[in-house]
Curated annotation (Swiss-Prot):
Organism: Brucella suis biovar 1 (strain 1330)
Transmembrane regions listed in the UniProt entry: none
InterPro entries: UreE, UreE_C_dom, UreE_N, UreE_N_sf
Keyword RNA-binding: no
Classification via NCBIfam families: PRK13261.2-6
Record's keyword terms, sorted: Chaperone, Cytoplasm, Nickel, Nickel insertion, Virulence
A single GO cellular-component term on record: cytoplasm
UniProt subcellular location: Cytoplasm
UniProt name for this protein: Urease accessory protein UreE 1
Length: 162
């Protein structure tokens, strides 16, 4: 089984045609070590030292030099619109307060479908529409850099933060 050993981000891709591609949903694009079946039926192993988030158009570089293109799957989402920019900000706050993954744009927000959240958002005056689209939510504050693993107390000191 060939191994994916590097990532080329979509904005760095040169016009070479990929050897194959794989379609992954948002949750499947967060990985560290995982066997993946390509569109052509071949299995590869994504094997990275740290967890990575793959975006639409990124490429995995295999240990034999081939490039595999990542395609984000279309998912069942809600498109959420508010009355004005302030209302959108308030809706984003309520979504974030519930720790939901959200793709936030200038005039709308996308989240995965959840009927309880839909009722809440409509109760707050949002217009909520069912859509099927690629979902690229914002990454959280802990997605890079200094991370706390929540299996321990935070009652410790960081010399570089004092």
């Amino acid at each position: 089984m060939f191994r994916a050993i590097a990532i080329i981000r979509a904005h760095e891709v040169i016009d070479a045609v990929p050897a194959s591609h794989i379609v992954l949903e948002r949750d499947e694009r967060h990985l560290r070590r995982k066997a993946i079946t390509l569109e052509n039926g071949e299995k590869i192993l994504a094997d990275f030292a740290e967890p990575v988030v793959l975006e639409h158009g990124d490429r995995l570089v295999l240990d034999d030099g081939r490039e595999i293109e990542i395609r984000a799957a279309s998912e069942e989402l809600y498109e959420i619109r508010g009355r004005d920019p302030r209302h959108i900000a308030e809706l984003a706050w309520h979504i974030g307060n519930r720790h939901l993954a959200a793709q936030i744009e200038t005039d709308r927000i996308f989240i995965l479908r959840d009927h309880v959240i839909r009722v809440m958002l409509e109760g707050l005056g949002a217009t909520v529409t069912d859509v099927v689209a690629i979902f690229s939510p914002l990454r959280g504050a802990y997605s890079g850099g200094h991370q706390h693993h929540h299996g321990h107390d935070h009652d410790h000191h960081h010399p570089d933060h004092e």
